[in-house]
Regions:
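Acidic, mature catalytic/reactive cores of soluble proteins
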Residues: 1-140
Length: 140
């Protein structure tokens, strides 16, 4: 999900993914392969074992948080997450200009952001007066 509106941290551009184990243990491969300045700039990488990875080029940076040990090869960071039944894991991809602090979001913050996002979109759709494609718009 991408938090909607001006929620808890409007200065941060993030995409969140929740991985929830239902049955069996599933291994996810997580890859980050950013292309800065239309692939004209190479990233400088910093690894944060057990927490995530950051790629920076010039004044731009992306950080992928998620309790993953990454390995960087060329312009790509790859790691793995195992999710078992009843387990919930989060990934948060964050873009910032001039990223400095390493601040992984906690599970509570991510859960609250999900709740806020759902509430935002429910309020938005409640005002939708579209006819014809309303069901498709609502579902999306």
């Amino acid at each position: 999900m991408m938090p909607g509106g001006s929620l808890r941290r409007p200065d941060v551009n993030r995409i969140h993914r929740r991985l929830r184990g239902v049955s069996g243990t599933v291994r996810f491969r997580v890859t980050l392969e950013p292309r800065f300045d239309y692939a004209r700039r190479e990233a400088t990488w910093s690894l944060h074992p057990g927490s995530g990875v950051r790629a920076v080029a010039g004044s731009e940076g992306v950080t992928l948080y998620g309790g993953v040990d990454f390995a960087v090869n060329g312009g790509r960071a790859t790691g793995f997450i195992d999710v078992s039944p009843g387990e919930t894991r989060w990934l948060a991809l964050e873009y910032r200009e001039r990223p400095t602090l390493w601040r992984p979001p906690g599970a509570r913050e991510l859960d609250e952001t999900l709740d806020d996002t759902i509430a935002y979109w429910r309020r938005w759709i409640s005002r939708c007066v579209m006819t014809g494609y309303r069901e498709a718009v609502t579902r999306s």
